[in-house]
A protein has these predicted regions:
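Pyridoxal 5′-phosphate
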Residues: 1-376
Length: 376
């Protein structure tokens, strides 16, 4: 028996996505910039895919830019706003691609305000309102935290920006929110939104960037006039079609999948909180049902991870993008966890493919692991 509970790192491509990618490699292999029939066939296929992905977030297809990943998109948005004397607002618990880009912006003369969170990763909206200034040009806040599942109040953040009279643009990293929470960029006032296909059972190496109509970003990759002049390079046609297929599959079932994920997370939550000493970093309420972060202060997370891996249970000690780093989680540190709680943390993350049997097996294996490792 195996239990894959590391879906926040990546997801298994669905059968329909695999079939779409494989068939398109042989059937729609043209360059979308070519004017002959082979190129036009590829361009038509990408145009249809663009419309499908746009509809999944309430956007127009002309507002979708394809790239290689959400990390690329995050870099592009932030670096496009860098100006000497500008002011950005972000949170202290962002993904490394945002965090490092903000550090780069600071070295380039931008002042960055990093909002603190409470013990469970929640923002203080009053602190956010007080941080807005006349020269604030960009606010960057993730929709769902990739380590804890904490959900940021994007609608309230947008309202606060508008009520203040600020001209700041709102960027949202929606990697852990796409196809997991309902997204309507129009209603939420989002100006830029980033996501990756491989987090929603699509292929790796393809991402999307929503750019609100009328806005423009600097290109990180210079060359041709691809993607409305905002991202040069020949398009990954098969990857894009696979991405669209994953959106087509998941979009009608967001609420159903959400409710099922909640029940699975509840089983994990109730089972693990029976273990003496376990600290829960992701409450059942007000967090994504797809992510559960816990801490076992009496052991090290990587020891538990390796033990579970031997048993066929796949979990992580935090962000996949930081798994090779020796530094403690900046997210859990910002939330005020102790060193033992941080070093003993593990993340369990679900998907619509997660089965009841996987949850039952993972719970059994984890309880066995805690009992065994506590004696070591």
């Amino acid at each position: 028996m195996e239990a894959y509970l590391d879906n926040a790192a990546t997801t298994r491509p669905s059968k329909a996505v695999i079939e779409k990618v494989c068939s398109s490699l042989g059937e729609v292999w043209g360059n979308t910039s070519s004017l002959h029939r082979v190129g036009m066939a590829a361009d038509d296929a990408v145009s249809e895919a663009r419309a499908i992905i746009a509809s999944g977030i309430g956007a127009q297809k002309e507002e979708i830019i394809f790239n290689a990943s959400a990390s690329e998109g995050n870099n592009q948005v932030i670096k496009s706003f860098i100006r000497e004397g500008a002011h950005f607002i972000t949170t202290s618990t962002e993904h490394p691609s945002v965090m490092r880009s903000m550090e780069y912006a600071e070295r380039s003369g931008v002042e960055v305000t990093r909002l603190k969170t409470d013990r469970y990763g929640n923002l203080d909206l009053d602190e956010f309102r007080a941080s807005l200034r006349k020269n604030t040009s960009l606010v960057s806040a993730m929709m769902v935290n990739n380590e804890t599942g904490a959900i940021n109040p994007i609608d309230e953040i947008d309202s606060a920006i508008k009520e203040s009279g600020s001209r700041a643009r709102l960027h949202v990293d929606a990697v852990q929110g796409l196809m997991k929470l309902p997204i309507d960029v129009r209603k939420s006032g989002i100006d830029f939104l980033t996501a990756s296909a491989h987090k929603v059972h699509g292929p790796k190496g393809v991402g999307m960037l929503y750019v609100r109509k009328g806005l423009k970003l600097e290109s990180l990759v210079h060359g041709g006039s691809h993607e409305m002049g905002m991202r040069a390079g020949t398009l990954n046609v098969s990857g894009i079609l696979g991405f669209a297929e994953s959106i087509r599959e998941m979009s009608p079932n967001i609420n159903e999948h959400y409710n099922r994920a909640y029940q699975l997370k509840k089983r994990l939550y109730e089972g693990l909180t029976q273990v003496e000493g376990i600290v829960v970093n992701s409450p059942l309420e007000y967090t994504s049902p797809y992510i559960l972060s816990i801490s076992a202060p009496f052991l090290r997370g990587e020891v538990l991870l390796r033990y579970l891996s031997e048993k066929g249970v796949c979990v992580s000690t935090g962000s996949a993008c930081s798994s090779n780093s020796t530094k403690d989680s900046h997210v859990l540190s910002a939330m005020g966890l102790s060193q033992k709680e941080i070093k003993g943390s593990v993340r369990l993350s679900l998907s619509p493919m997660t089965s009841d049997d996987e949850i039952a097996y993972a719970l059994e294996a984890m309880k066995e692991a805690f009992s065994f490792l506590r004696r070591k």
